[in-house]
Amino acid sequence: MSLQEQFDQAASNVRNLKSLPSDNDLLELYALFKQASAGDADPANRPGLLDLKGKAKFDAWHKKAGLSKEDAQKAYIAKVESLIASLGLQ
């Protein structure tokens, strides 16, 4: 199975976890997914001051700047596998 196929499968598995991951885990998943699919975050697109959730998500993604698509995919897959081991799938 190719890396892209493994990444796509991991993204599908996230939706089938038995319980919701912690906020920190969700931010990590979001950041790795965005880095793998869109590349580096553009600081000019950072959400406004009052959008706390949007800022947290953007900042988590921005911290992954410079991480290659492949490395982000591998990290995402590893994170999902870790969550499956601790939370299980439905």
From Swiss-Prot:
Organism of origin: Manduca sexta
The organism's place on the tree of life at top rank: Eukaryota
The entry's keywords: Lipid-binding, Transport
Residues annotated as domain ACB: 3-89
Record keyword Transport present: yes
Stated role: Binds medium- and long-chain acyl-CoA esters with very high affinity and may function as an intracellular carrier of acyl-CoA esters.
Official protein name in the record: Acyl-CoA-binding protein homolog
Magnesium is among the record's keywords: no
InterPro entries, per database record: Acyl-CoA-binding_prot_CS, Acyl-CoA-binding_protein, Acyl-CoA-binding_sf, FERM/acyl-CoA-bd_prot_sf
GO molecular function: fatty-acyl-CoA binding
Lineage: Eukaryota, Metazoa, Ecdysozoa, Arthropoda, Hexapoda
Membrane-crossing segments per the record: none
Family: Belongs to the ACBP family.
